[in-house]
From Swiss-Prot:
Cell compartment(s), UniProt: Cell membrane
Single GO term (MF): 2 iron, 2 sulfur cluster binding
Membrane topology note: Single-pass membrane protein
Protein name listed in UniProt: Ubiquinol-cytochrome c reductase iron-sulfur subunit
Function statement: Component of the ubiquinol-cytochrome c reductase complex (complex III or cytochrome b-c1 complex), which is a respiratory chain that generates an electrochemical potential coupled to ATP synthesis.
Complex and partners: The main subunits of complex b-c1 are: cytochrome b, cytochrome c1 and the Rieske protein.
Binding-site residues for [2Fe-2S] cluster, renumbered to this chain: 120, 122, 139, 142
Bilayer-crossing regions: 18-38
Organism: Rickettsia conorii (strain ATCC VR-613 / Malish 7)
Pfam families referenced in this protein's UniProt entry, alphabetically: Rieske, UCR_Fe-S_N
Note: The Rieske protein is a high potential 2Fe-2S protein.
Length: 177
């Protein structure tokens, strides 16, 4: 009788070993199969390289708008005149389609620099600088008009021109992204 009990214990032990081994092999196989899939979700090297750019502002004259490319999108960098800043700040919030104060769209201490993504918020066209009734941007596709702060004033666009994440590295250099 003790031989039979020993056999049952050995069979159970062998079975447990086989289940554990098979489970381990299956788990390792699953990890080896899923690893490339998960790794492919990471951004590629060229995307990481474009994730942030530095822009020298010293060549942008007062009243001038320059377009740079960031993550495949046009970004408008405008060195606004004191008159345009005063004009943008005088606008009543009730007159705006997407109310946002001019001060919220620029960095404190750098009120003359406006940085916006140059894509119309209606259907994605690229607006023209220093155009339109409000002397800001005019979208030639469907007629949306933005003021000198990039806020939508007229037309089908529902939102203001987006402000990308950016920081001032120095008074004459910014990092976008």
């Amino acid at each position: 009788m003790s031989d039979t009990e020993d056999n049952k214990n050995k069979q159970t032990t062998r079975r447990d070993f086989m289940v554990l081994t098979a489970s381990s092999v299956a788990a390792i196989g699953a990890v080896c199969t899923l690893w490339p899939l998960v790794d492919s979700l990471n951004p590629s090297a060229d995307v990481l390289a474009l994730s942030s750019i530095e822009v020298d502002l010293s060549n942008i004259a007062v009243g001038q708008t320059v377009t740079v490319k960031w993550q495949g999108k046009p970004v408008f960098i405008t060195n606004r005149t004191p008159d345009k800043i005063a004009e943008a700040r005088a606008v009543k919030m009730s007159e705006l389609i997407d109310p946002e104060a001019d001060q919220a769209r620029v960095k404190a201490g750098h009120d003359n620099w406006l940085v916006t993504i140059g894509i119309c918020t209606h259907l994605g066209c690229v607006p023209l600088a220093n155009q339109g009734e409000y002397d800001g941007w005019f979208c030639p596709c469907h007629g949306s008009q933005y003021d000198s702060s990039g806020r939508v004033r007229r037309g089908p666009a529902p939102l203001n021109l987006a402000v990308p994440p950016y920081t001032f590295i120095s008074d004459k250099k910014i990092r976008i992204g």
